[in-house]
Regions:
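SAM-dependent methyltransferase catalytic region
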Residues: 2-141
Length: 141
């Protein structure tokens, strides 16, 4: 059984399957027009485990996914960084995401357990990752 845990919620096997089904429903058209491809969770974990441990332990480190999709890499970062830091600190000070598709940003925030009251809410934004100014503040314009 696959269970992923964040600081505020659990993602059960059923929830993971629901997310997979949603992605399939997006259809080939969206993939053709946007080039949208999601990195599988197991590959995200392998990539994050390649980050040097001293960087993972650094409470001042920042991690950016400039094409975050629905948050696979961000969720994996949250899981691994929470082994070293308080999950609130990870969400509010360490991880950042940008994606062009608004529904992906919404899903990523939900998967991270973010609410509009959280500082980290403003660290996952809907924007063009190639032209965004990369200033993550509480008043996004």
């Amino acid at each position: 059984m696959l269970t992923m845990t964040t600081n505020k919620s659990k993602m059960s096997t059923t929830t993971v399957q629901t997310e997979i089904d949603k992605q399939k429903k997006r259809g080939r058209n969206r993939v053709k027009t946007t080039g949208e491809v999601f990195t599988p969770m197991d590959l995200c974990m392998r990539m994050v485990r390649e980050i040097p441990e001293e960087k993972l332990k650094d409470a001042d480190a920042k991690f950016l996914d400039n094409s975050c999709g629905d948050g696979n890499f961000l969720v994996t970062l949250l899981e691994v960084l929470s082994e070293y830091h308080d999950p609130k600190h990870v969400l509010n000070e360490m991880i950042y995401g940008v994606d062009l598709m608004e529904d992906n940003v919404t899903t990523a925030k939900e998967r991270l357990g973010l609410t509009p009251k959280d500082k980290g809410w403003h660290h996952v934004v809907c924007a063009d990752g190639l032209s965004y100014n990369y200033e993550f503040t509480e008043s996004i314009t």
